[in-house]
């Protein structure tokens, strides 16, 4: 059974605090829109699909007990607030738009019913879509590379912790592993928040998938033995330009140089057809402390872990200026394919054409 980042049952919602992983499991109850805003903003929950799901379910949970004569305005204002938490991940904006349309189309108590149903459907749909992405992607990669066992490189975290379960890019890797087609998976540490070392490495170990953790800067030296690079996406523009975790662009350039397929995986929800290209993507910047500090359990004499004692350590000069973008944009011409639950999209004479 995969890790569960989002727990929703009987109108109660909680999320796994991913800032404490991999050493501590703690679920945070989400009882209000502000609770959801906080965990998304603080990256206690992250991953474009998971952000949208938590936002939608938080509004649904709050609707159960909210007392207001204007449910329509409550829903619209709630999603406007949640949209401010993370500006790059398109999934949140897509579900906010859909919920606005539902709120505008119904009256009174009907609004409460349809919004809750859509939030619950989103949770179930995401899990189904992830399994489809995994199957379509694994079939595509095996046919493209034409080897029985593959060595894969992935970046950031795109698994159960970033979605409702199974994952997108990591879903493809899971599907390959289920087919006995994984030789080894290399995952980058993914600075500055180390989602690769804290989360992806943890998921791979949890599923007993042969894996090795590397620093971000090691990628060039191992790229010649990589069969495919598989990453997720936070926003894909109409032309295929893809915003994803910072460092994705570097991997795409390396993959191009070494003639390694570079594959993007994500739900069709992540494709923003209103965005012509990646130049229009708003890139979120995080506080400099996320770059100049690290946090984790105390280790005595390099051997004894004190898991109950978590400390922050400053690893850079105190007054250094730090630039800490969360995402970069990979041009479409560096991407071999975009795998969604609808289809595997590859470039044609006119580039990427997303139609379903």
Curated annotation (Swiss-Prot):
Molecular function via GO: S-methyl-5-thioribose-1-phosphate isomerase activity
Site (Transition state stabilizer): residue numbering on this chain: 156
GO CC annotations on file: cytoplasm; nucleus
Keyword match NAD: no
Entry similarity comment: Belongs to the eIF-2B alpha/beta/delta subunits family. MtnA subfamily.
Role according to the record: Catalyzes the interconversion of methylthioribose-1-phosphate (MTR-1-P) into methylthioribulose-1-phosphate (MTRu-1-P).
Protein name, per record: Methylthioribose-1-phosphate isomerase
Species in which this protein is naturally found: Schizosaccharomyces japonicus (strain yFS275 / FY16936) (Fission yeast)
Gene: mri1
């Amino acid at each position: 059974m995969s890790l569960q980042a989002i727990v929703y049952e009987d109108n109660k919602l909680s999320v796994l605090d991913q800032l404490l992983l991999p050493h501590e499991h703690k679920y945070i109850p989400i009882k209000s829109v502000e609770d959801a805003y906080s965990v998304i903003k603080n990256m206690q929950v992250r991953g474009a699909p998971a952000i949208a799901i938590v936002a939608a379910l938080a509004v649904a949970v709050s609707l159960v007990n909210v007392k207001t004569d204007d449910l329509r305005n409550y829903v619209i204002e709630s999603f406007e607030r949640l949209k401010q938490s993370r500006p790059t991940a398109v999934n949140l904006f897509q579900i906010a738009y859909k919920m606005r349309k539902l709120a505008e189309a119904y009256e009174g108590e009907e609004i409460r019913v349809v919004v809750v149903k859509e939030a619950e459907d989103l949770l179930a749909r995401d899990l189904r879509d992830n399994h489809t992405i995994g199957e379509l992607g694994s079939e595509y990669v095996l046919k493209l590379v034409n080897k029985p066992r593959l060595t894969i490189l992935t970046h950031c975290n795109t698994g159960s912790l970033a979605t409702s379960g199974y994952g997108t890019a990591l879903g493809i890797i899971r599907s390959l592993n289920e087919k006995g087609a994984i030789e080894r998976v290399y995952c980058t540490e993914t600075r500055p928040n180390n989602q690769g070392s804290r989360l992806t490495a943890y998921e791979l170990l949890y599923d007993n998938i042969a894996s090795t953790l590397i620093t971000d800067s090691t990628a060039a030296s191992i790229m010649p033995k990589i069969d495919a690079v598989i990453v997720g996406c936070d926003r894909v523009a109409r032309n295929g330009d893809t915003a994803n975790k910072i460092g994705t662009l570097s991997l795409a350039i390396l993959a191009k140089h070494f003639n390694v397929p570079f594959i993007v995986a994500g739900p069709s929800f992540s494709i923003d057809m209103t965005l012509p290209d990646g130049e229009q993507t708003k890139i979120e910047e995080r506080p400099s402390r996320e770059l100049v500090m690290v946090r984790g359990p105390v280790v005595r004499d390099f051997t004894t872990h004190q898991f109950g004692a978590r400390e922050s350590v400053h690893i850079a000069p105190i007054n250094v200026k730090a630039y800490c973008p969360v995402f970069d944009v990979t041009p479409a011409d560096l991407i071999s394919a975009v795998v969604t639950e609808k289809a595997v999209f590859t470039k044609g004479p006119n580039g990427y054409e997303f139609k379903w």
